[in-house]
Amino acid sequence: MDRVVLMLSVLSLGVSSQPITDGQRLFSIAVSRVQHLHLLAQRLFSDFESSLQTEEQRQLNKIFLQDFCNSDYIISPIDKHETQRSSVLKLLSISYRLVESWEFPSRSLAGGSAPRNQISPKLSELKTGIHLLIRANEDGAELFPDSSALQLAPYGDYYQSPGTDESLRRTYELLACFKKDMHKVETYLTVAKCRLSPEANCTL
């Protein structure tokens, strides 16, 4: 118990000097963290797009629409209606898997600026927070029965040395997928948090 309280205190980062015992408050911290990551992902993607020529943007967007993110292999709600029908535990489980899938690829986003270097540690903190929420909602014994199938490849041959055009495509893909997945996690955690308030309107 003392260990859990310590972890919650670290996650709060000064939000409160007292141990966090209320699930609603822990959800608020997790939602705040993923909102920060989503905004950061949007900014990084926007900055990268701004550095491209108009034709490069058009071609890369066209290619991305025909491609898939690695995390697409993680089964998740197909629309807002299915999201709203999903249980809190299911939304937490999917969020955990999405965040976990970025632990290794996020290293390629680091470097060049302070915000970029914050991504990996913030993902790690978010993952810890979601895991605590999962433990509070379930014993976790059979939470990830198919986890062995979720060893996603780190975006194929992304870490090899490509030519200039291929490097642009891979960077575009990485940033676009990161933005997409952080939006998903933000949505799932927001809906799950709302479920703790029976009188709240959780409509997306």
Swiss-Prot record:
Where it sits in the cell: the answer is:
Secreted
Which GO cellular component terms are attached? extracellular space
Which positions make up the signal peptide?
1-17
One of this protein's Pfam families, by short name?
Hormone_1
The biological process GO terms on file are:
animal organ development; growth hormone receptor signaling pathway; positive regulation of growth; positive regulation of receptor signaling pathway via JAK-STAT; response to nutrient levels
Q: Which UniProt keywords apply?
A: Disulfide bond, Hormone, Metal-binding, Pyrrolidone carboxylic acid, Secreted, Signal, Zinc
Q: Domain of life here?
A: Eukaryota
Cystine links in this protein are: C69-C177, C194-C202
Residues modified as Pyrrolidone carboxylic acid:
Q18
Q: What does this protein do?
A: Growth hormone plays an important role in growth control and is involved in the regulation of several anabolic processes. Implicated as an osmoregulatory substance important for seawater adaptation.
User: What is this protein called in UniProt?
Assistant: Somatotropin
Species whose genome carries this gene: Acanthopagrus latus (Yellowfin seabream)
